[in-house]
Amino acid sequence: MPKTIVRHLAYLFYLGVLILPILVLDHEEALIRPFRDQLSSYIALIALNILLLEFFLSGRIRFLSRHLGLDWVLQTHQLFARVALAFLVIHPFIYSLPNHPNHSPGPATSEYLGMNGAGLISGIAALIALIAIVALALGREEAKMRYETWRFTHMLLAVIVSALGLYHVLAVGFYIQQHTLQIYYLSLGILAALSLAWTYILKPLTQSREAYAITKIENITSQQFLLTIKKLSGSLPQIQPGQYLWLKYGSSKPYPENPFSIALVNHEQKEMSLLIKVVGDFTAQLQQARIGERIYIDAAYGDFAQHALNSEKPIVMIAGGIGLAPFLSVLSKAKEIAFKNKIHFIYGNRLEDQIIDIAKLIQLADLKSLTIETIVSEPTAAYTGLCGMIDLNNIQTSLQKAQLNPKECLFFICGPSAMIDATEAALEQLAVPLAQIDAEKFQYNLAAHTPRTQATLARCIIGTLLIIAVSVWRSLS
């Protein structure tokens, strides 16, 4: 089944799960409250549902990342976190019923709200923590926050928000008094906690028994190195070209841990290599590691370029800097299966000395159909390739030199988020259908005017409007 259809079906299923609580509650009991109070309670229940489901859309469930792609999973995670925040900010102002008198507090009824004491405080605290989560996620780069610090803070705040939110709903909610909804939310909360425990407690314990050892560290350029690791016992996990892993250095404890694309795999030697750029403390420590030191991994994730070598269309790979890494595994697989289709590789860097000689890492003699075009934004006088950014003009020039019609090609893009956005915008101007473009990002600039961003926002807006429409319908019917 085509990936696009799978993603559409998955999205419909996700929306169905979101509205499930307001569909299963006892509607006869719901009709005894005013419309506004019903609507407010409904969107609050859906918001809590979103927050608990976020634990399963963090990108750490291998099945989802392999079949739906990291791009889809993280987009859904990030966008619907904002939907939940909007619902939770709005819902207190929709209520029309008064609160219980101070001299006679009590649970929510058909005539009064139950916003008193710990129930009220927990709701306010959960909302503040959720605002902090979204703010840190949006402003991490501007604040120059270390990735490991942000991940730990994000996880900790998510636990706080979910626990306080669940307590708030159980303490002051009107419809949550129904046994069916209590079971649903408590079960979902337990499953969310178990998913967290699996990722950060149980999985590290299993990783400690499946260690890897560093066998080689090769400096490829001044800021990029190839880290080769070997599994000490057993065989390598199943790895497809273009996938990535989570890596820990020195210890299997939950933190620090970082994602890296898998560049090369040698199943016979039980080795894999990662192309890494030094951008912070963690990668700098890896570059200075000693041969034989232990590495612990969680692999493999993602579906980037999974179907690149199954198509009859010409393949165009566009990499910015360290975005070369996943393409090395794709090219290695293409060589292994004697791939005959045209492959055109566009490789951009800021400086010439940052260009990696792919032929030194992969024997490309068998890939007769491969052509490589380099682009340098700050060239020296001796440089003879294309100059500037990976933009419309350079992409068009490169494709013309390779005698390729962009409308007939499949495009795979990897690199910094801004570079991916710019490349997708350029391909839109070349009339390349979005279905022929594959890119995988960890962060998203929703202000970028690209076909993918517009489609993502449209999907989220339509889904949100559908949720609101169902909530209104249930409140009125």
What positions do the PLM features span?
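Conserved beta-strand elements of the Class I
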Residues: 314-318, 410-412
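Membrane-embedded alpha-helical bundles of multi-pass integral membrane proteins
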Residues: 2-197
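Histidine-anchored nucleotide/phosphate-binding helix
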Residues: 324-338
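Reductase modules of NAD(P)H-dependent flavoproteins
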Residues: 2-13, 17-19, 97, 159, ...
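Short, conserved phosphate/pyrophosphate- and ester-handling motifs at nucleotide-, phospho-/glycolipid
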Residues: 77, 154, 242, 323, ...
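Hydrophobic alpha-helical transmembrane segments in integral membrane proteins
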Residues: 173, 177, 197-213, 256, ...
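A short, basic/flexible loop-to-alpha-helix module at the beginning of a structural domain
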Residues: 300-311
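Ferredoxin-reductase
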Residues: 206-296, 312-314, 349-351, 362, ...
